[in-house]
């Protein structure tokens, strides 16, 4: 081999070694994070979240099931994925996989990990790592009768799975049934209702009322369904909501008749709204609901929705709809929080009722 060919092979070998070193280095966390991340957030596929890389330096698109992963390219942990590096002797790269979990047994039927099933018309359940989690289909604890409903109670409706709220004391529960629909804890906003949209689209606009907040204190979520879009398709909308802060001091009850909600005072100074790892760019003085002197639940009565800008990752600003309370009122039927529901559901599951 000539001297020229030997030099050329040596140069190519050095270049290949340099490229492999760069690729290997890009898979591991650097000793220091770069001084600045890309100004443009990564463009992820629909349904794929933007997360911090495994080094907590810059945002990247979360890797999905079956895709390659490393320290710099983490798997989507919110989907239960982990990076399996058993095939790499250097333990640097791997494949995003779902951990193998235990099966579930319910009412004599075996369900695989991740399998969804409906034990009856009232619940939708999922088997996850040997545990069964269920969500209710009947939202009677979220959809409450109005404050003008005397002696509300649940009644079974022939041919339907879910019970309905009824008003009055009639034994049959037919005259006082609320038209087959329960009234939500929130009153309609200006945009809520059924009205004819643009005649050229030939779409009848339908929007439900907002559900009760998922948490009795602290930041929660509220949902509704609407077809207010160009496709005239029913879609689910969510908004953030906070009925009262969890650290709120109990109010001194002065109204003995119990006809009014004792509203809490606004914050003396404006506060930042927070959810998960996000903080609002601007400060607000929100109004909260207090307590009822007769022991009933004090929940929002009139609300509106505003768009609030939050900053989550450095340089990333998102907008979220947030509930703003106008007035509050007292209810006899209190919406259950998630913890209470889970305890009740666990009890029913142990008894084999669902």
From Swiss-Prot:
Protein's cellular compartments: Secreted; Cytoplasm; Cell junction, Gap junction
Record-annotated disulphide pairs: 29-55, 33-57, 37-58, 44-61, 69-83, 75-96, 261-298, 278-312, 289-328, 292-330, 297-334
Principal cellular location given in the protein's record: secreted
GO CC list: cytoplasm; cytosol; extracellular region; extracellular space; gap junction; intracellular membrane-bounded organelle
BP GO terms, sorted: angiogenesis; bone regeneration; cell adhesion mediated by integrin; cell chemotaxis; chondrocyte differentiation; endothelial cell chemotaxis; endothelial cell-cell adhesion; fibroblast migration
The organism of origin for this protein: Mus musculus
Chain ranges of the IGFBP N-terminal domain: 25-99
PANTHER family in the record: CCN FAMILY MEMBER 3 (PTHR11348:SF8), CONNECTIVE TISSUE GROWTH FACTOR-RELATED (PTHR11348)
Residues carrying sugar: 91, 277
Gene of this entry: Ccn3
TSP type-1 domain span: 202-247
Protein name: CCN family member 3
Stretch forming the signal peptide: 1-21
Knockout consequences: Mutants develop normally but have enhanced arterial neointimal hyperplasia in response to injury. Animals show an accelerated bone regeneration comparing to in wild-type mice.
